């Protein structure tokens, strides 16, 4: 049987929501443990220019923003770890979360901030140009393409409306 580690507050996910939760939990002396998941820093790490985040009037790169949030969470005592939640027993508290298939963490406070994952088409060089013309968020990046010809694939009516 796997050894069980007990923590006050467990956060799964390292995007803006995960790190913001970690900052607040740390300031509340909950000793948060945050597991980064598959993409440390979340989707923003693939964004070149973030101009709609408060506090950065000149904008900031996605990777830099996530480094800043990580540093602030660490400043307030967050234990940031690499690992992937592979199973969860949420039937009753304390909750049991399995990390990487073999480590079990038990917690009374669980924050799941796993965010979203963009669906790409699988075209050659698509990932190479992510954030440099290829975007997965019309709401986030539409501003950069004002008065330009664009192609929108997927998203139902949502992205088409965002483009207009």
Predicted features and spans:
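Extreme N-terminal leader/targeting segments of oxidoreductases
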Residues: 1-9, 67, 75, 83, ...
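Rossmann-like dinucleotide/flavin-binding elements
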Residues: 2-6, 11-37, 130, 136-164
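Core beta-strand elements of the Rossmann-like FAD/NAD(P) dinucleotide-binding domain
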Residues: 5-7, 99-109
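Redox-cofactor binding/interface segments in oxidoreductases and associated redox assembly factors
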Residues: 12, 106, 112-113, 152
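Short alpha-helical segment within the catalytic ATP-binding CA
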Residues: 20, 44, 113
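N-terminal glycine-rich anion-binding loops that anchor highly charged ligand groups
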Residues: 34-46
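N-terminal Rossmann-like dinucleotide/flavin-binding domain of flavoprotein oxidoreductases
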Residues: 45-104
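Glycine-rich beta-alpha-beta "Rossmann" dinucleotide-binding loop(s) and their flanking helix/strand
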Residues: 110, 114-137
């Amino acid at each position: 049987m796997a050894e069980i580690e007990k923590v006050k507050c467990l956060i799964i996910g390292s995007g803006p929501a995960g790190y913001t939760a970690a900052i607040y939990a740390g300031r509340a002396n909950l000793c948060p443990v945050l597991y980064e998941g598959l993409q440390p820093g979340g989707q923003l790490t693939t964004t070149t220019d973030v101009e709609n985040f408060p506090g950065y009037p000149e904008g900031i790169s996605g990777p830099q923003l996530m480094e800043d949030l990580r540093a602030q969470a660490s400043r307030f005592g967050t234990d940031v770890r690499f690992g992937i939640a592979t199973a969860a027993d949420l039937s009753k508290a304390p909750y049991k979360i399995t990390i990487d298939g073999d480590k079990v963490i038990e917690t009374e406070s669980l924050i799941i901030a796993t965010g979203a994952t963009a669906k790409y088409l699988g075209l050659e060089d698509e990932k190479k140009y992510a954030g440099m013309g290829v975007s997965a968020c019309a709401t986030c990046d539409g501003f950069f393409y004002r008065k330009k010809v664009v192609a929108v694939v997927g998203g139902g009516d949502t992205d088409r409306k965002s483009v207009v």
